[in-house]
């Protein structure tokens, strides 16, 4: 994933110093894009080992429409712990918006179900969009959505996805987000009888926290390994029926994990 390292190097060399909500401080650039051809391998970072279990379970948690960390905790995933209240609740975050977006007239929209139906019925539509950014509920969320909106595109029997990430924590968050949405693209492609195409990652405020600079420099000294393969259980034909056991990662070789603090 040389593209990811190129982004990290660009921010280190050309980024502007900025303050931020957490008080940590960042080095930041505005606007960046990376494209991953999913036929060439699963875009899971190899210059530091990632916890694939957390990536898969978090995505399944989103798809369930869940907004309480109990499911994550039950499966050994702690990435949302810092933002949950004493009951484990996060407010109307991703799962709520993906599955139960509340309209002005009181209806509830299942954006994921609507998306699948739209891709199957009218693949050439330019409206295959899911948004997690709900201005009416942002203030009630423990953390407003960083990966805010994604769009699917069908051409030549292949399904591609583009994500817009308004706030991109390059060292900790972005590797998870790339893998998560690449996996979602593969899942949606399978249930819609399409082949995975490209995953396009588009970032807004792309930043390295000041307490991640040393770790970023360390990672830039490492040479990427070939990408692994992600195998999905071909018998699953319903997006909402996928389970953790339906995913098999093959050939993942990675450099050791690099620890870094989370900015809350």
Swiss-Prot record:
Its EC number is 2.1.1.45. Pathway: Pyrimidine metabolism; dTTP biosynthesis. Keywords: Cytoplasm, Methyltransferase, Nucleotide biosynthesis, Transferase. It catalyses: dUMP + (6R)-5,10-methylene-5,6,7,8-tetrahydrofolate = 7,8-dihydrofolate + dTMP. PROSITE patterns: THYMIDYLATE_SYNTHASE. The keyword Methyltransferase applies. It is found in: Cytoplasm. Belongs to the thymidylate synthase family. Bacterial-type ThyA subfamily. Catalyzes the reductive methylation of 2'-deoxyuridine-5'-monophosphate (dUMP) to 2'-deoxythymidine-5'-monophosphate (dTMP) while utilizing 5,10-methylenetetrahydrofolate (mTHF) as the methyl donor and reductant in the reaction, yielding dihydrofolate (DHF) as a by-product. This enzymatic reaction provides an intracellular de novo source of dTMP, an essential precursor for DNA biosynthesis. This is Thymidylate synthase. It comes from Azoarcus sp. (strain BH72). The gene is thyA.
């Amino acid at each position: 994933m040389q593209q990811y390292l190129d982004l990290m190097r660009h921010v280190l060399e050309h980024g502007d110093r900025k303050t931020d909500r957490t008080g940590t401080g960042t080095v930041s650039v505005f606007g960046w894009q990376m494209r991953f051809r999913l036929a060439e391998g699963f875009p899971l970072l190899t210059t530091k080992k990632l916890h694939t279990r957390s990536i898969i379970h978090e995505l399944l948690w989103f798809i369930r429409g869940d907004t309480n960390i109990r499911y994550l905790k039950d499966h050994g995933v702690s990435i949302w712990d810092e933002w949950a209240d004493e009951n484990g609740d996060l407010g109307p975050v991703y799962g709520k918006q993906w599955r139960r977006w509340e309209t002005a007239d009181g209806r509830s929209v299942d954006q994921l179900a609507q998306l699948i139906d739209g891709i199957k019925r009218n693949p050439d539509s330019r409206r295959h969009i899911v948004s997690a950014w709900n201005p009416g509920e942002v203030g009630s969320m423990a953390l407003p959505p960083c990966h805010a909106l994604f769009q699917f595109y069908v051409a030549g029997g292949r399904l591609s996805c583009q994500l817009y990430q308004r706030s991109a924590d390059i060292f900790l968050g972005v590797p998870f987000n790339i893998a998560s949405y690449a996996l979602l693209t593969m899942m949606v492609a399978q249930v819609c009888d399409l082949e995975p195409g490209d995953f396009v990652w588009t970032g807004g405020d792309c930043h390295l926290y000041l307490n991640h600079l040393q770790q970023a420099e360390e990672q830039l000294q490492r040479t990427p390994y070939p990408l692994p393969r992600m195998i999905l259980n071909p018998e699953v034909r319903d997006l909402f029926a996928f389970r953790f056991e339906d995913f098999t990662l093959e050939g993942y070789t990675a450099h050791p994990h690099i620890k870094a603090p989370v900015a809350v």
